[in-house]
Amino acid sequence: MARRKSTASTPDPTVAALLQTLNPHAAGIDVGATELWVCVPPGARSSPCSSAPGVPTVLPPHVRRFGTFTADLHAIAAWLRQCQVTTVAMESTGVYWIPLDDLLESTGFQVLLVDPRQVQRAPNRPKTDVHDCQWIQRLHSLGLLTAAFRPEEPMRVWRSYQRHRANLIEDAGRHLQRIEKALEQMNVKLPEVVSDITGLTGMSIIRAIVRGERDPQALAKLRDRRCKESAATIARALQGTWQPEHLFALQQSLALYDYYHEQLQACDRVIEEHLKGLALPEVPALEPTRRVRRRRDNEVTFDARQRLHHVTGVDLTAIEGIEESTALVVLSEIGTDMSRWPSEKHFGSWLG
């Protein structure tokens, strides 16, 4: 039986005629790790370009391939200006788009960052990089692409700091797991008698072990008076085998755990300084909270409640279930401009 010819790659001319070009000076860019394919409006005037190695010898004059070095990014911006492009659409692929986006925005282009799923869902999408950038350009010129949400530039800086801070916490957590592993390999049952080994009792005992203390009775005396287990029970749990290789692993893991917490404190100082620059004018200080609680291991080292109040003008921690750490992360991701969503229902839908 003869195969039916597919018409998926050929747009219906009747439908195409009904679509109006809304962005006549739009370009489309297909972003990759090693190359960037750029398509400007067909008919845009530009100087001729010789094909780069590995690039098809026959390319439409409005399509070019660039590398991803900084000089290549500047070359893209120069070509777009030459072609009188004012707005550029690209997919948010990994982190490869960030340097080009920053450069284009800083040089006056309007950049439309698009969720890749939006472009993929559009029918008739081609499968090659050469055609992909043309497809993005065409969709953008017809006004069929919607910008992905991005907070304002100061908020994006804050978001980067917060995400880096989360990575530091994750790295510190890995070394805490290695501390627990080394203790278990020496049959030191500290986690069984102390609910949180990063607390006062747990860390006092671990640091004493690293300093050379092996006597279970002496180690048990380091327990905090609020510890539920008795000194005798803790002493029995601390009768370890003390193999040198596991002691060495414990020593190094503790040093790395401390190092990442030092980096956390440095990160907190940078975040606090950045929040000072985001503060609204003439916002009165909050009254001190009556709640008294012990500071948690990974909490920020500055008064986040006050800083957030100066940024937003309201006390976000007054919302039930919202603590300082939660408010810091959420606000750094979405910013303070709630007008981006028509209503709280739209905001909730965007959150998923």
Could you describe each region identified by the protein language model?
Residues 1-352:
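A detector of single, family-specific signature residues
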